[in-house]
């Protein structure tokens, strides 16, 4: 049982994913990282079969890195989403499909706009202002629909995420622990939901909360 959320605001994207890993009714890990940084302003939250998710996330990350090395700049969110969708669509038509659902979020530095994409294992892609995968779909989309609006600031986005998490914990029998990141023009930062004001914490400690992300190399063959 997994759960992930994505929320866009005026100039940011928030991605959150649970940290549980298990099979059937058995939980094997409670610190699994299901968020993968793909670039300085691009990340995804993934869920699905354990082996498929790890292999697919690594495959996507390495190919994004290869694009950086070849072209000296990162792949922008619209192009990245198209390539990820095509990869899943081709895989499901092969003998080795990926049972992976994901939320791809990023900030386009050329247009200064946030992007969020809902993608499933069938290769279906939708551009959305907010989204969820897993068990959270059944109880949180109505909360997002009620409280979301286009020009939400970062603090309001975190508050909406907390509403979704609270609703999920209230309606479901399983308690989830969440890993959360925020993507904006300044890069990717970890959101500590245990803090009273996570956004103020990011502003006060930008380096401590920054998530390490691959950057374009200076020269071909030289890593950043």
From Swiss-Prot:
Annotated keywords: Cytoplasm, Nucleus, Proteasome
Signal peptide coordinates: none
Domain of life assignment: Eukaryota
Family annotation (SUPFAM superfamilies): N-terminal nucleophile aminohydrolases (Ntn hydrolases) (SSF56235)
One GO cellular component term: endoplasmic reticulum membrane
Subcellular compartments: Cytoplasm; Nucleus
InterPro entries listed in its UniProt record: Ntn_hydrolases_N, Proteasome_beta2, Proteasome_bsu_CS, Proteasome_sua/b, Proteasome_suB-type
GO biological process: proteasomal ubiquitin-independent protein catabolic process; proteasome-mediated ubiquitin-dependent protein catabolic process
A Pfam family: Proteasome
UniProt-listed Gene3D superfamilies: Glutamine Phosphoribosylpyrophosphate, subunit 1, domain 1
Major place of residence: cytoplasm
GO molecular function, one term: endopeptidase activator activity
Assembly mode: The 26S proteasome consists of a 20S proteasome core and two 19S regulatory subunits. The 20S proteasome core is composed of 28 subunits that are arranged in four stacked rings, resulting in a barrel-shaped structure. The two end rings are each formed by seven alpha subunits, and the two central rings are each formed by seven beta subunits. The catalytic chamber with the active sites is on the inside of the barrel.
Annotated family: Belongs to the peptidase T1B family.
Function per UniProt: Non-catalytic component of the proteasome, a multicatalytic proteinase complex which is characterized by its ability to cleave peptides with Arg, Phe, Tyr, Leu, and Glu adjacent to the leaving group at neutral or slightly basic pH. The proteasome has an ATP-dependent proteolytic activity.
Protein name: Probable proteasome subunit beta type-4
Source species: Cryptococcus neoformans var. neoformans serotype D (strain JEC21 / ATCC MYA-565)
Gene of this entry: CPR1
